Amino acid sequence: MLGNLKKIFDKNEIEIRKARKIVERINQLDEKARKTSFEEMKSYILQYKGKLENIEELDEHLEQVFAYVRETARRTVGMRHFDVQLIGGIVLHKGKIAEMKTGEGKTLVATAPIVLNSLMNRNIHVVTVNDYLAKRDAMWMGPIYLALGLRVGIINTTGKAYEVVWKNPELAEKGLKENYCVWPDDYDGEFLSDEMKVKKAVEAFEVDIIEVSKKEAYRCDVTYGTNSEFGFDYLRDNLVVSLDDKVQMGHFYAIVDEVDSILIDEARTPLIISGPSKNNASVYKHFYQIAKRLEKDKHFKVDEEHRTVLLTDEGIEYLEKLLGVDNLYDPANVNSIYHITNSLKAIHLFKKDVDYIVHNGQVLIVDEFTGRVLPGRRYSGGLHQAIEAKEGVPIKEESITYATITYQNYFRMYEKLAGMTGTAKTEEQEFKAIYGMDVVVIPTHKPMIRIDHDDLIYRSVEEKYKAIVEEIKKRHEKGQPVLVGTTSIEKSEKLSEMLKKEGIPHQVLNAKYHEKEAQIVAQAGQKGMVTIATNMAGRGTDIKLGPGVKELGGLLIIGTERHESRRIDNQLRGRSGRQGDPGESIFFLSVEDDLMRIFGGDRIQKVMDMVKIEPGQPIYHPLLTKLIEQVQKKVEGINFSVRKYLLELDSVLDTQRRAIYGYRDNILERDVDDFISEAIDNFVEARIEEFCSGVEWDWEGLKNSFAVIKDFVKIDTKIDDKEKLKQDIIEQITKAYRLKKEEFGEDFEHVAKFIVLRIIDENWRQYLEEVEHVKESIRLRSYGQKDPVLEFKKETYDMFNDMMMRTYELSVSYLLNLRRVDNKAEEESKKELAKVSTVHDEFRLIAEESKDSDKKKPKLKIKR
């Protein structure tokens, strides 16, 4: 074990040593860079931009580009990369994860590898967790990019897009020409306060944003945006009917900020483009009432560990009587099982003010990792409707899926993927296994002096909360600021009530008060401030210490229980002790906490029985501390297995998705002829194999199978050779297709593309719907000791082939039966597509679970 640890640290140390040598060479270029004009630095970038033949050539320019970026940052934004920030940049350039502590300046770190990789003249994506950070970071770092001749775009979840530009172009041009510098010549310190910045340079290099089309934002050198919007744009690009409507420029290089949050915490959350379904709201109410009549452990079992519900034999019999059916698991009754299990989950596994809140008559999901409300997101598969029935709020229509992809498979499309976070090392195995990314721990610029105390463990939740209140009271009396981290809204409000009774002034930050987040966080480090927060205080915020707080020991972090992941605990601790500041952290635990109760079980209780201690006193026992860590590792392992399992399922779909999207791209970029030729071949071959195998050929069956195009195919029953018969039919259909093209002339291409793309999309949509039912059924089969992934592969393979055959047949028959009519078929299709919306599916159990073209096209009608 020790040997393995040593190996890990050695590996990290080797990586850092290599990077330090490169940084030493960059530092040697520093003096020369100081004397280089803006124009010369920009010329260097533009000289090589688009001229490199392969990505490996970038390394030849790394030192010079990094030196120029550092100097440009010093002059335009008054920030100079520390050596450790350059090390972080080197790690990002290599397609790895840079683990950097809070306050180490990750935003600035990304600039050097972005400018370097821009030499490939391909769009680079910087991925953030929310719109605010995307806009802030793009504008904050914008002057660096603009000064070096790069364009900066921003996309956000409202569908709007922007480009960063100089606020006063004439003044900026003057500043660049005369080499203005925000950093004063006579200042050699490390940090530059706003008061010390050279005013004329600050004014010259101020930026603004202008609204542009999303397509234009993607044509910039670097585009900042959220993970969900990048993913949705990819899906929307694969629903368009015109190449001009595509916005993305491929997937070359992405730098993911808060990479653990996006690639791990959200990995169970597929992106889905959906539209409304036809399920009636009364159905959900009906099954909710039935579910309330079922008794736990008698009619069903609840598995909290895996967050699922399983009907018992007695429960199945009871439901069969109640619903008046002979066999609940008959395919005809699959919807009943689906509604019952969703209702049971809504009642027993999804808790108000923990998993969701009810606000203005709506059920709003709360992100379990950040504590933030996720507006617009809904659980899929009818689960959200089941919760709405439980809460007695209006039930919204269930949705049907048009396109979907997991974050895992979306981000694996990038040729080079890198990430930054304060907490990644504990998940290194997963990053490597799923994304092929190594984690490199970057040294801090200043030593970390925060004190992390041992856990205090209590027998009951009540004892724990009393101890927390006492600790807060003691620290508050001396003026030390305290940030208390809770795991749910419910618990944050309970603690708030206790503090009110004690007369301790405090502020609460949870999903209900998220509008005040920036204001609350800004005050959290001030003297005497007490802040209670859910996980949402853990990311994208910087807590600065107020006057006199360092002398009091800095910010105290109190954790009220351990999270399922050690990484989330580390994020909470990381709010204190930034940039060498003093600070403390301590966790108060109870053996009744959810994590201990669900996963620790008897082992923790046995240790408790061994320890004799007075009520209200904390327990110190090395075995107990070790057990808690084992419990967290166990849960991390379970969650990793779930994510890996989901990836295996989605990877089957991913191959099929790429095939479908490949067909679409070929049709959009070229013409429809190749696809139709393939469709005719496959369609005819399948019919020949079906009806002309064996001794007796089924001529009648063969004729009927071509009924939809009977006007164009005459079956010659005199041909007794299968291959000749096939070729004869193919030639007849191909000739009919050629004549149809001639009839329509130049209009045909637009019409044919539109029809075939819509057929592909509709069949793919139906296929995705069927796949969801397969996922549900194989989850049940997994209880019967069958490998669910293997079962899934088998079933979807045949289903996909059937779907493709339907697509081929429909494409051929629709095009051959085309005739000119002045109607609004296409406009109706567009109206239907306009109903399509984007949702974000929670997809827990297995895990639980377009854009219109602006071009005018010829009118058409399908004759069948």
From Swiss-Prot:
Q: Give me the residues that bind ATP, please.
A: Q85, G103, E104, G105, K106, T107, D542
**First-tier enzyme category under EC:** translocase
Listed under GO biological process in this entry are: intracellular protein transmembrane transport; protein import; protein targeting; protein transport by the Sec complex
Q: Which SUPFAM superfamilies match?
A: Helical scaffold and wing domains of SecA, P-loop containing nucleoside triphosphate hydrolases, Pre-protein crosslinking domain of SecA
Which GO molecular-function terms appear in the entry?
ATP binding; protein-exporting ATPase activity
Q: Where are the transmembrane segments?
A: none
Domain of life, source organism: Bacteria
The encoding gene is: secA
Record's bilayer topology term = Peripheral membrane protein
Subcellular localization, as worded in the UniProt entry: Cell inner membrane; Cytoplasm
For this protein, the Enzyme Commission number is 7.4.2.8
**Family matches, as Pfam families:** P-loop_SecA, SecA_DEAD, SecA_PP_bind, SecA_SW
- PROSITE patterns for this protein: SECA, SECA_MOTOR_DEAD
Which family would the database say this protein is a member of? Answer: Belongs to the SecA family.
- A single cellular component GO annotation: cytosol
Which CDD domains does the UniProt record give? DEXDc_SecA, SF2_C_secA
What is the protein's name according to its record?
Answer: Protein translocase subunit SecA
Q: How does it assemble?
A: Monomer and homodimer. Part of the essential Sec protein translocation apparatus which comprises SecA, SecYEG and auxiliary proteins SecDF. Other proteins may also be involved.
What keywords are assigned to this protein? ATP-binding, Cell inner membrane, Cell membrane, Cytoplasm, Membrane, Nucleotide-binding, Protein transport, Translocase, Translocation, Transport
As for what it does, the entry says:
Part of the Sec protein translocase complex. Interacts with the SecYEG preprotein conducting channel. Has a central role in coupling the hydrolysis of ATP to the transfer of proteins into and across the cell membrane, serving as an ATP-driven molecular motor driving the stepwise translocation of polypeptide chains across the membrane.
Catalytic activity line of the entry: ATP + H2O + cellular proteinSide 1 = ADP + phosphate + cellular proteinSide 2
